[in-house]
Amino acid sequence: MLKKKITLMSAAAAALVGAVAALSVPIGASAESPSAQEIMVKAAAEAVLECGESVAAEFRKRAMDPGGASAIITASGKVLTRDDGKWITPEQEPDSDREISIVFVGDIIFETGQNPWSSIAYSDGIRACFDDETWGTLTGADFLVVNNEFPYTDGGTPTPGKTFTFRCAPWTAEWLGEMGTDIAALANNHVYDYGEEGALDTFDTLDEQGIPYIGAGRNIDDAEQTAYCIANGTTVAILNATEIERYENPDTREAGEDSPGVFRMLDTTRLCEKIREAKEKADLCIVYAHWGTEKMPSQDWSQTTKAQELAEAGADLIVGSHPHVLQNIEYVDGVPVFYSLGNYFFGAAARDTGVLRVTVNTENPSISSLQFIPMLQYRGVSTMEGSEKQRVLDEMQSVSPGVVIDEDGYFTQE
């Protein structure tokens, strides 16, 4: 299995990336306190919790008191340390495989009112919602990034006047771990549906599950944090921001100096600064943007403008969500932009969907291939084959001039 780590860092903490060292802790053993914590910060370690049960995904954990821990040792031997309330895995020896895969999926929700297919998960488990090939694509990714389009909370109150407000019980976050989720993207227009309480519950829940999140946080430094995915000596930075609710006082609050919320990109100045900052520390930088107009098959004026700005800032790939439908692919000054992955596990209608698989060459750090894998959301999610697969690829090709998409979904600039 590929050895990897994900580090979530603020600008100040990112300067410590080079100090991350390898840890070697046998399964079932305890790390000496405070040495694990000293990997990243000098704060005194409080405790090391040992997690003896099986874990379904690399970053899933179960612990009695995760909030007070400095480190957790999972049954697989993976050590997670903390920096500013986030779980961090230590860098390990390079794997013999010289490529890593990052899979992006679009909108997901586990609320049965908005996604009736999720009722299957409540009765039979999340695995029953995906066919074998789709499940293998998700769990087989070295890094899986999902757009988590709702808060995990039993509290809070719905945003007054907002037409659609969603929430799911905190325990359902376990399903993210079972799916193999490595990063939950929270910069969207629903994470704040149940106000500050709902947002804070979401952050606590994901911390407890050991699932890193980006795009929202307890304050602006937290919300702006970059995820640094490190494997085989290669670092890929991932940023997440939203422009949705394009008005001065949006329902979804922007994070402040001392208040929770999302990382907004209505004005891309700060996001572009974060891209440039990330490129100083990482080999590649990917932006996952929540943008666009619902139900439009191609990008709108704002996406066009912002894609240009993000590309000029140094983004190597831009991936989008929010429109609830698949949108076109375009190259902007040589930078691939997949404007919208659409709904993935969201909504009641049968809908074409899919995932974007990014393959990174770690010998000469670069994106070696981009593949769109067509899928169908209907009674769960299944991978398309034959004529239906080709139909979706043909439709994507028809709205993506300047791009060549082959029969397997691999695409390149014409």
Question: Which residues fall in each region the model found?
Answer:
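Short, low-complexity interaction segments enriched in Ser/Thr/Pro/Gly
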Residues: 1-2, 39
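Sec-dependent N-terminal signal peptides of Gram-positive bacterial secreted proteins and lipoproteins
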Residues: 2-28
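Acidic, metal/ion-coordinating pockets
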Residues: 28, 32-414
